[in-house]
Amino acid sequence: MSTFNFDPEVLFRRRRPRVVRSPRFTRIRKILLIVLAVIVVLVIIALALMSLRVNFLYLSSLGHSNVFWTPLIAQVVLFLIGLVLTGALVGVSVPFWSRAVSGIDARAGRITFWTGIAIAVLAGIGGGSHLAGEWQDVLLFLHGHAFGATDPVFHMDYGFYVFTLPVIDGVSALLWGAAVLGLLGACAVVAVSLTIIHAPEEVDVQLHPATGKSVDDALRIGILHAGAALAAIFVLASLGAHFSVYHLATESNSQYSFVGPNATDLNVLIPVLTALQVIALLFAVATIALLVRRSRRRPTWRTVAWLGGLLGGWLILAGALTSIPEAVYTAASVNPNAESAQAKSIDNYLTASRYAWGLQATGSQPSVVNQPFKTVVTPTLNVDLAADPGTLANVRVQDPTQLPAVLNQLDRTRAYQTFDNNITVDRYPNASGQETEVMVGVREIAEGDIPNSNFVNDTFVYTHGYGITAVSVSQIGPEGEPEILDGKEPLQQVQSGAPPALDFDGTGGNPEIYCGEQTSQPVVVNTNQLEFNYPSTPDAYMHAGTQMAGFTINNPFDKLATSISQFGGLNLFLSGIPNSQSKVLINRTVTQRIESIAPFLSVDSDPYIVADPETGDLMWIADAYVETGNFPESDNVNGISYQRNAVKAVVNARTCAVTLYAVDPTEPLTAAWSAIYPGLLHPISQMPSFLVQHLRYPENLFSNQVQVYSQVQVDDQLPVSNPQVASDFFSKNNFYSPSQGLQPDGTAVPTTPQYLELTLPGNPTPQFVLMQTFSPYNSGSGGQASNMTAWLAAESDYTVTDHPPLVAVPLGNNTNVRGPYQFDNNSNTDPAISQQRTLLGESGSQVVLGNVIVLPFNDDSFLFVRPFYVLPNQSSGVSFPQLRYVIVGTQNSVALGTSLPTALEALYNTTSLPAGLNPTTTSPSPSPSPSPSPSPGATPTPSASPTASPPAGGYTPQELAIIGDLVTQEANLKADYASGNLAAAGQAQAAINADISQLSQLLASGGVTLPTPTAASPTPSP
């Protein structure tokens, strides 16, 4: 019997897998990988060069090639500076690393050297990329201007915070990165050296040091290098503590609702940071002294421990000094006396915020003019309202949020055209020269609805929109539609009372719209393919013309670059449709086009279109801002602490040419950018006069100012040093919030600023203003806290001044003035209005309320106006809101009417209205059907006689009596709706339904069947 001998070594012996090697295959694979990598790199470079080339062609076509070269050169130069600076700072450490490691192993020392070089190069690339990304800050630093005003805490010119401090932070980040990398590398060398020196004797460490070197040499060099890097870090920490003091000026103190150093910062943290500057320098000196003292001794772990102790001691000391004294001072001194303790900080915040946001007079900058309001009363019809015919003539009953859907149904004319959601609210002089408020919609190309969408149609044929549509803000058509002043079948006059600037006859002007708010995809014009223009015009197909602000593609590389970078493929490159006269239009969105030639500007979200009264040309105007988040002690809104409407940008809707007008060339940021891009900004004095007449106060700036003003307005008639100011601010006693309104479902939503034509207190001339009402702070729940406490209006007359003022109208705390929320609440609880909403809901219609308009009259009263839209049953998927009613109200009452005059008649219970209020168009009459189209058998408007002649056919006397009653009740129904007497209208409708039911029964016996009537509803018919 054989014996089995088990050998564990055999069981656990590692066996190498059998590998069949193919040297030829390995070489081919390596070559393929290298070729693939080279191709990828070349493709990336080619795509980047194509994008650069197209951008150069585009900017050159606009006459602003410096906008291409200035950022590019700045970024390249800064990248090289960052590359060399960071690479050199890290590269200084490489020889030390290599020499130190050579004392351990000569081959490892050589590897360390090349590895260090690679690290230095990578660090340089990172540093260069970081610095190149700061190109705007660097250019501003080089061209910066003093503000001529200093912050109230550190008394440094505001330009230091805006222009200088960001660059210091950027350079500091590079230095910190290089110092930390050097310290980490030295620490690695020291750690390896100590590990080898103190390795157990039984561990056999095979060392191959360079000739004449040892592990002790490696440790010594590593310690010296680590100490030098640590000393550099202490110096940087000292500088950081110094500049951290200035960063306190932009820190937010949310607990107390202000920005800037608080009481603890001023009295504790700033002195601590000043002390830490000195302490950090002492630590740097101590580190250098330690290195000098121990440089000639044999290095030991004790030296390393000393260095570690210095670093740890600094971290503990800095942390303790910046936290413990603060906590003690806050608890012992600030919290028990917070109001008086924070008074100085509040004063500083109010001073800086009012300056930064243009809420105080600062030379030529906008100022807030406070206009007192008289004791608020209920407006009387023949005194208050009649005293202000300018406001009455422009009461806005049409709502810009609903108008796009209406125009897309009434005046879209083609499926591939659409009206953008941003309706322009503007003013034009009427035939009498009086300023008239209108709303203007722009008929742009609907890029998603182009018929037979393909590359040719999208790029060469359907290239532009066509014309505008203007409507009256105050008139309502017979079926609840807006009164179109111009634009129906584009550029044909419809309403004889249209403002002259909109009174086109279709023979002049350039109505084509190549640049708009929705026009985004690139196109090519002036090609061998005619463009579709408009079917009812003589030029149904056309070429755009040579004046277009596009670029040509006359060589293969330009054509290929444009095809790939802008059109995402080779279709354009392979197409034979473009010719030598063709021009490519890119960046066709108004905002995008402006930002592409002025990357330093932030463009307002609501560009508006203007018609030239002489040529009919259409021009886009967009407000653009210079802004920064580095302004000290100023309120911060969405990361912005300083904002100025620096530029009025004009874009020709047809040619897409852009002109930038500087509102105030002396403003520091504007002046700096003008120096960086000479010739880019033009003085606003060069703007054509017809454009100046349409300039308006910018919406985004005003919205931000409203947010800031709601709290910095506290006691703005008193000096900020007055103790009452800090007291009221601390308690938020006089803080405001934008007023809220109610939606039909009861949801409270903030009101937004509205462009209105009205008369401001102290000025009898109607003006075009941007207005916002305020309620007490944090009054979102409604009730008594939702009263109106103030309103703020921004004038827009740039023909008088380049900086129209803000007009603030505080209403005082002693008067309870109802606000939009309370007006909406009264409307929702009004029996007649509630009944109408219920009836509409039962018929399947939907109520949509427009914006609440608050109109001041005679410096002592307010009138509330809100449009009441009805959406028919939405089963068809078509949105067609129609303005069926207007809700008006005062302090004590509300009323409903089918137009503003009828609503006022119901509100004041009169039929005698002031001159100018009589409707010029037929008021909408409630339709008995929710269908969006007229009923074919609608009852005609009755005559004055309540009886009607029966139709031929031999009706019985009973049938004739019912028919006569039907006619009478129909007349009553229309009269009741016109007067806003909804209760009586409901009774008339019930009588009509009863008559129809009775008549149906009588006629059925004779073989005649009446159509089944639908439930009555005021839903409009288009």
Where are the model-predicted features located?
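Soluble extracytoplasmic regions of secretory-pathway and membrane proteins
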Residues: T3-K30, V35-S979, A983-P1020
